[in-house]
Amino acid sequence: MDYNIFEAVHEQQSSTSDMDLSEEDNNPFVGTHHLYASGIGTTIGEARPENENSPPSSSSLPSSPAHSSSAGSSRASTSSSTSSHAVVEADAETEPFVSLSMSTTATISKFTPHDMNGTQQIQIIDAGDFKDPWGKHAIGYVILYENNKIIRRYSEFHSLRQSLTRLLPTIIIPPIPSKHSLLKYIWSPINAANDSKIISTRKKMLNSFLSNCLNIQEISNDIVFQKFLNPEFNWKDVLSSSPIIILPLNNLLAPPLSPTKPSPLHSILPIPSNSSLRNYNSIWQQHITVKSHNEISNLPTEILQNESQFTHIENLFQNYKRIITHLLKNIRSNKSHFHSLSTYFAELGAYYNAFSLENDITMPNSLRESENNSNNPMMEIISHIEKTGHSFDVIYISSEILIEKYTSILEDPINELLQFLNESFKVLNFKKLKFLQFKILERLIIEKETKLSSLTEIENQLQKINESLTRSTILTDENYKDTKAADLTFVKKDVRSLSKSSSNSSSSGHQNEIHIGASKLNYKTSTPTMNLNKLEIKQLTEQERSKQIKQLNQDLSKLKDCLSICISDMLEINNSSYNSLMHTYNHINLTIGKILKLFAASFKAWIKECLKNWKLAKLQIDEAL
């Protein structure tokens, strides 16, 4: 059994379950599905790393049961010496509480670990059942950072990650273990005594989450993340204070690099729907291929040039996701098959050992007490059978270690990389939504400008008509009626032609149309501020037209300011998200190489251990013959 994985659970139960702890420490089958899970005294205390960032070496495999037994004794003593961190009763209730303050501070006298660059590392050193300040039980994780201990619950890790996602929308936030469903909490709530494997897995992944966050400068410098690692801050109070409470509901309504400081214009920006992402490629191609008649459609050259890089990264990540998903399925399948093989080894060892014991029991006492017992053929056969069974036992234990490494070195890191890729796509989608927001503003501006142009043209035409009517008043009284009739005919023709041209100019490529009829031009309405798409221009008075023109100019001014802000946001998103995507790309490449090398070393060590064991058994049998 891997002590490093279940160390926290042993420590939690040491004060109340010393007998059980001692039994588990000497049992290599604990945590397996084998029938004989309580009979062979050994351990794999050095089989796995303390955390995911320091996987085991090939020398960690046990060479003999004696080595395993000594490791078991060492582990038991370590467990008793560290039981002071212990958590209280193991019959703890579950985890589905609201976020509680689990913070505690303690100065650590021992040296805090550092990496090769001298940077102080962060580590989760314990996990188990704790009591909060209100006396409730919860599963807590003890974080060691800067010589302080901070206890945080899983729900607090979850809320931290959600907050970081909103505070840093252009940064890929490292993943954490998935949250269990509410149904599972109802039927089988997490318990420190019964779910030690789940807790230890979360402990490793949360440790990886914190380490990855510290390696990302934007996250490590964030005030919320710093408060999370500060034992003096109550996490519940952090979530109900600035900057969390002043974040916008949607990051598209705030500056991407400083969402807590939006401008007044950010609040009136349009929000494109997520369903519009399906048409992103076609909209982008249309934008760069169709020559726009308006200068507002021109994006900065930097945005146009960077788009090909983002497309390449997205295609690369899609390919990574496809390969990793298939690889993860194969890993789980191979792990299951290898576990079956390990079970066969255990059964073979049990059969050989039982057979040797059976012959030993049925042997007459006279043969046992004989001085020439060493030369007795029956005793030699029993010894050979026992050595063979012992070899199968050792191979079984080594195989169980390798299965655990399948999880710690291969399956869990690969699954984490898959979550990294999913988070990368969210950042890419945020960038796409910002461009779609730009396209909405662009369309609104073009519509407003078209309306303003039509309204201005009509105003100019009506002024010409009024001037023509004014000139007719200087005619003599005798010709006044004829001149008036002629002018009215001219007015009707001019209005009809104007109506056609206005209708054609406003309906081409836009939803709203402007119509002019043959009714009186000075018709007054009871709603002078009614939208132009609901009220025909012919019904507007001169004052109403002037008001509409003024309103359109104001709207256009705001929309153009919004467009400038949107373009500025796009530039910031491109720069920040590109750096984050490249950081993730490098992290994935390095992690995959590290995973393959470590697992190859572990598999090679397992093969060597098996070969060494069989050679030793053969040598002992040959010497006895």
Curated annotation (Swiss-Prot):
PROSITE patterns: PX
GO molecular function (one): phosphatidylinositol-3-phosphate binding
Membrane topology per record: Peripheral membrane protein
Binding positions for a 1,2-diacyl-sn-glycero-3-phospho-(1D-myo-inositol-3-phosphate) per the UniProt entry: 153, 155, 179, 202
Pfam families cross-referenced by the UniProt entry: PX
Other comments on record: Present with 450 molecules/cell in log phase SD medium.
Record-given protein name: Sorting nexin-41
